[in-house]
C-alpha cells in the first residue's frame, strides 16, 4: 500500500488534533534567574502558593510569589548547582516535617533532618508545617500552671498551659536563660518541650544542647535549629516546623511547651526573602504581612478541649484536653518596645516578661521588671499556695520602686516609708536566683511566706539569700512531712501555716545561716 504525500499530511494533522496535552507540561517550568537563594521560574502554570517545587539534584524549593508570567520561589538548602535553563517540576504537595515521639531527645534542622550525628529519626508520621489554628469553639480557658521554677515569674507573672507569654528584652539580658530554666524545671511534670533556635551562632546552640543533656532535660525535649549560617528560608521556616512538632502532642491530649528563640531573627529572615522577591517594603522595610507572619504562628498555641482531642484521634483518646504553650522571645534595640516587631508580638501574646539591661547590670538576675511585666490569663492557672502568698510581693515591689525614686530627693523619711523601703530591698534580694536552679512549688511558697510575714525584715540584705537557702535545707531535714503536704496539695492549710511559722522561728533562733 502506497500513501501519497497529501494523505500523510492529513494523517499527521488528524493525529495532532486528537492529541491530548500531557498535564506534565503545565507542571514544568524553566529557571530564568537564580540570586541569593531566590529563583524565578517561567512556565509553571499550575502551582499553589507554598507548594514544594522539585529542582535538579534532589533539591526542593517553596513557591512564594505567583505572578502573571513567572513564579518566585525560595530554595531550601544549597543552590550553587542550580543554573538558568534548569527544569523545575511541581510536586502537588505542601512542605511537611516529621512528627512524633521519635523526635524527642534529638536535634533537627528546619526540615526535620537530624543534625546531631545520632542516625536517622525514623518518625512514622509527617505533617504540614502551615496549619490553621484551632477555632474558638474547640478551645478551653487556661487553668493549669506551667511552673518555670523562677521565683519572680511564678509569683508575679504566672504562665498557664496553652498561654502565649512573650519574653522581651535587649541582647544579653538573660532571655534564653529564663527559657532554659523553664525547660529544665519540667522534669517529671509530663510536659514535652521544644526549643527552636533561630539565627543563633552554632556554638550557642551547642551550649544549649549540652546544658539540656547535663540536666537530663533532653529526655523530654526536641531542639529545632536554624543557625546563623543557615539560609534565610530555613530561619523563616524553623518556628513553623517546631510548632507542627508541638501540635502532634497537643492534638493527642498531651501538654507541650515551645520556645521560639528568637522571633526577631525570623522577622529579619522573612524581610530578607520578601525584599529579594521584590515585594513592596513597608515600615522598617518589613513586608506588609509581617504581623500575619507571627500571628498565624502564635495562634496555634492553645489549650484544646476534650471534644477536639477525641475528634482528632477518632475516639482513641477520650476525656483528655491538650495544650501547646508558647514562649516567644523578642530582642529589642536599646529597650525600644515601640519598634514594629515588638509591638506586633506584644499585641498577639497573652502577656510579656520584660527584662531590663539596668537591672541585669545591677546584679538583679533574672532582670525582670515587675512593673511592666504582665500575664493576662496566667492568674487563673496559678497554684493555690502561690496565689495566696504572692499578692503582697507584687504590691511591696511596686511601692518600693515608687518610694525609691522619691527617697533619692528626701533627706528625712518617716518610719512607715523607711520600713517600706527596707522591705522592698529584701524582697528584691529574695527574687534573685542563680541560673539552672529552678525551684519547686514548696520552696517558692516558703520564700514568699517568709517575706510576707516579716521574717526577713530584721535580716541584713546580704543575709537574705543565705537565710532562704539555709531554711530550705532545714525544712528538708527536719520537716519533710510538711514539705510533702505543701507539694502534694499545692495549698497551705491553717495547721500547716502554724507549723511553718514555728519551723521558721526555730530556724531563726538557731542562727544557722
From Swiss-Prot:
Tell me any Pfam family this protein matches: ATP-synt_ab
So where does ATP get bound? Answer: 169-176
> Recorded GO terms, molecular function?
ADP binding; ATP binding; proton-transporting ATP synthase activity, rotational mechanism
Which CDD domains does its entry note? ATP-synt_F1_alpha_C, ATP-synt_F1_alpha_N, F1-ATPase_alpha_CD
Tagged with keyword tRNA processing: no
Which of the seven top EC classes does this enzyme belong to?
translocase
- Keyword set includes Zinc: no
User: Which UniProt keyword terms apply here?
Assistant: ATP synthesis, ATP-binding, Cell inner membrane, Cell membrane, CF(1), Hydrogen ion transport, Ion transport, Membrane, Nucleotide-binding, Translocase, Transport
Its subcellular locations are: Cell inner membrane
How is this protein situated with respect to the membrane? Peripheral membrane protein
**Entry's EC annotation:** 7.1.2.2
Sites marked Required for activity: 373
Task: Name the InterPro entries on file.
Answer: ATP_synth_asu-like_sf (IPR023366), ATP_synth_asu_C (IPR000793), ATP_synth_asu_C_sf (IPR038376), ATP_synth_F1_a_nt-bd_dom (IPR033732), ATP_synth_F1_asu (IPR005294), ATPase_a/bsu_AS (IPR020003), ATPase_F1/V1/A1_a/bsu_N (IPR004100), ATPase_F1/V1/A1_a/bsu_N_sf (IPR036121)
Which cellular component terms (GO) are annotated to the entry? plasma membrane; proton-transporting ATP synthase complex
The chemistry this enzyme catalyses reads: ATP + H2O + 4 H(+)(in) = ADP + phosphate + 5 H(+)(out)
Function, please? Produces ATP from ADP in the presence of a proton gradient across the membrane. The alpha chain is a regulatory subunit.
Q: Which HAMAP family match?
A: ATP_synth_alpha_bact (MF_01346)
Query: What does the sequence similarity comment in the record state about its family?
Result: Belongs to the ATPase alpha/beta chains family.
What is the annotated quaternary arrangement, including any partners?
Answer: F-type ATPases have 2 components, CF(1) - the catalytic core - and CF(0) - the membrane proton channel. CF(1) has five subunits: alpha(3), beta(3), gamma(1), delta(1), epsilon(1). CF(0) has three main subunits: a(1), b(2) and c(9-12). The alpha and beta chains form an alternating ring which encloses part of the gamma chain. CF(1) is attached to CF(0) by a central stalk formed by the gamma and epsilon chains, while a peripheral stalk is formed by the delta and b chains.
Q: NCBIfam families per the record?
A: atpA, PRK13343.1
**Name of the protein in question:** ATP synthase subunit alpha
Which organism does this record belong to? Burkholderia multivorans (strain ATCC 17616 / 249)
Amino acid at each position: 500500500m502506497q500513501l501519497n504525500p497529501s494523505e500523510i499530511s492529513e494523517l499527521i494533522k488528524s493525529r495532532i488534533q486528537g492529541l491530548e496535552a500531557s498535564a506534565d507540561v503545565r507542571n514544568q517550568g524553566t529557571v530564568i534567574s537564580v540570586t541569593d537563594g531566590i529563583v524565578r521560574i517561567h512556565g509553571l502554570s499550575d502551582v499553589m502558593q507554598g507548594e514544594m517545587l522539585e529542582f535538579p539534584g534532589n533539591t526542593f524549593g517553596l513557591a512564594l510569589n505567583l505572578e502573571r508570567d513567572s513564579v518566585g520561589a525560595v530554595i531550601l538548602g544549597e543552590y550553587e548547582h542550580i543554573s538558568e535553563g534548569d527544569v523545575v517540576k511541581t510536586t502537588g504537595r505542601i512542605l511537611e516535617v516529621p512528627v512524633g515521639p521519635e523526635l524527642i531527645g534529638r536535634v533537627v534542622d528546619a526540615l526535620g533532618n537530624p543534625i546531631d550525628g545520632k542516625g536517622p529519626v525514623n518518625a512514622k508520621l509527617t505533617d504540614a508545617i502551615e496549619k490553621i489554628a484551632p477555632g474558638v469553639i474547640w478551645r478551653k480557658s487556661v487553668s493549669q500552671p506551667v511552673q518555670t521554677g523562677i521565683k519572680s515569674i511564678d509569683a508575679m507573672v504566672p504562665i498557664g498551659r496553652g498561654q502565649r507569654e512573650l519574653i522581651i528584652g535587649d541582647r544579653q539580658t538573660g532571655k534564653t536563660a529564663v527559657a532554659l530554666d523553664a525547660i529544665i524545671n519540667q522534669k517529671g511534670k509530663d510536659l514535652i518541650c521544644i526549643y527552636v533556635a533561630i539565627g543563633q551562632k552554632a556554638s550557642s546552640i551547642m551550649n544549649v544542647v549540652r546544658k539540656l543533656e547535663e540536666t537530663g532535660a533532653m529526655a523530654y525535649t526536641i531542639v529545632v535549629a536554624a543557625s546563623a549560617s543557615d539560609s534565610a528560608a530555613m530561619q523563616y521556616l524553623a518556628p513553623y516546623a517546631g510548632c507542627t512538632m508541638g501540635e502532634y502532642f497537643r492534638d493527642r491530649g498531651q501538654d507541650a511547651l515551645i520556645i521560639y528563640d528568637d522571633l526577631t531573627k525570623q522577622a529579619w529572615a522573612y524581610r530578607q526573602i520578601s525584599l529579594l522577591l521584590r515585594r513592596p517594603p513597608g515600615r522598617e522595610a518589613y513586608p506588609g504581612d509581617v504581623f500575619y507572619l507571627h500571628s498565624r504562628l502564635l495562634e496555634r498555641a492553645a489549650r484544646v478541649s476534650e471534644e477536639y482531642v477525641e475528634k482528632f484521634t477518632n475516639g482513641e483518646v477520650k476525656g483528655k484536653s491538650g495544650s501547646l504553650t508558647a514562649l516567644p522571645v523578642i530582642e529589642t534595640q536599646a529597650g525600644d518596645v515601640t519598634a514594629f516587631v515588638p509591638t506586633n508580638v506584644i499585641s498577639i501574646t497573652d502577656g510579656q516578661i520584660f527584662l531590663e539591661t539596668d537591672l541585669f547590670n545591677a546584679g538583679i538576675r533574672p532582670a525582670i521588671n515587675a512593673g511592666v511585666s504582665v500575664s493576662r490569663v496566667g492568674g487563673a492557672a496559678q497554684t493555690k499556695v502561690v496565689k495566696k502568698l504572692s499578692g503582697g510581693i507584687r504590691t511591696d515591689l511596686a511601692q518600693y520602686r515608687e518610694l525609691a525614686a522619691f527617697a533619692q530627693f528626701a533627706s528625712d523619711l518617716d518610719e512607715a516609708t523607711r520600713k517600706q523601703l527596707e522591705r522592698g530591698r529584701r524582697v528584691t534580694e529574695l527574687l534573685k536566683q542563680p541560673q539552672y536552679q529552678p525551684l519547686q512549688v514548696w520552696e517558692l511558697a516558703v520564700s514568699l511566706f517568709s517575706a510576707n510575714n516579716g521574717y526577713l525584715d530584721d535580716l541584713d540584705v546580704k543575709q537574705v539569700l543565705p537565710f532562704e537557702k539555709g531554711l530550705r535545707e532545714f525544712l528538708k531535714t527536719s520537716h519533710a512531712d510538711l514539705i510533702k503536704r505543701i507539694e502534694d496539695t499545692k495549698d497551705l492549710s491553717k495547721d500547716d501555716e502554724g507549723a511553718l511559722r514555728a519551723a521558721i522561728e526555730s530556724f531563726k533562733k538557731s542562727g544557722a545561716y
